[in-house]
Amino acid sequence: MSYAVKSLNQGDRELIAFRIGDQEFCVNIMSVREIRGWTPATAMPHSPAYMLGVINLRGAVLPIIDLAARLGMKPADPTARHVIIVAQVRRKVVGLLVDAVSDILTVTDEIIQPTPEISSDLERQFARGILAIDKRMICLIELEALFSETESEAA
């Protein structure tokens, strides 16, 4: 039995797209470890407002980040419909709370457009670019930019 393996062309990259509110974002799929359903987190004292707390992921403590709040959007009110994207950020693994995962995209660097100058400083800080695919506008998030070196070490 043979399995078809899709290989990427030189310059292609795979991204995982997800929704937060009415907006669509994406991250490099190579950073994503797994996608799991929402699990209530245990709050941690003196943590940033965007950190919901921690969960037990197969014996490991996983910090859960409200990605909406971290991006300067209205904080999420997690429900069973939300999902956690477990991702590698620098040398740490974190959980990113999003509304839903929508797609896996294969794109070339040429379709990634620069973030407009009129965007907020916060948006430009985290956004690597914008993808216009069909009638969708998808913001490419740079996960490493979400956390300073010290925050990443603390996570």
Swiss-Prot record:
CheW-like domain span: 12-152
Assigned GO CC terms: cytosol
Gene Ontology annotations of biological process type: chemotaxis; signal transduction
Subcellular location per the Swiss-Prot or TrEMBL entry: Cytoplasm
SUPFAM superfamilies: CheW-like
Protein encoded by which gene: cheW
Function: May be involved in the transmission of sensory signals.
The protein's name in its UniProt record: Probable chemotaxis protein CheW
InterPro entries found in the cross-reference section: CheW, CheW-like_dom_sf, CheW-lke_dom
Keyword line: Chemotaxis, Cytoplasm
Species the sequence originates in: Rhizobium etli (strain ATCC 51251 / DSM 11541 / JCM 21823 / NBRC 15573 / CFN 42)
